[in-house]
Amino acid sequence: LLKNNGILPLNKEKIKTVGIVGPNADSRKALVGNYHGTASRYCTIQEGIQDYLGDDVRVLASVGCDLFRDRTEHLAFTQDRLAEAKIVAENSDIVILCVGLDETLEGEEGDTGNSYASGDKETLQLPQVQLDLMEAMAESGKPVVLCLMAGSDIDLSYAEEHFDAV
């Protein structure tokens, strides 16, 4: 926990709707990293938040963007899920934004010259589509909790400046 302006722990009594947004929110790949065995049970961030909040708090979800591609579906328009993420934020009391990398983007067995094929990273920034999603969530005016899932260093300066918890 790098930052908490008092928003955490979540107060289930005061929250009516939570938005869970981001490509790693419901991703099992993001949980395991690139060196892993087989767990007997996985619990994604989205599943864990839903379990914690129970039936009294409404949970809205959106993938928001792909991990690094400019669209989530091959034939879709660019930023095809960004509008959906904005609507989730607009209709939520708080947004939990789950960004980062997974085993497909970081590791040692990939193409070392290709940062999008588990190769060496050329920057500490998240992929541009995730930076765009972060900016859209900051512009929503809603409290945002950033949950970073990555096995390497990531520049979080934007998140520290614009979000309520990191």
Name each region found by the language model.
Residues 1-166:
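C-terminal non-catalytic regions of proteins with extracellular/luminal or membrane-system context
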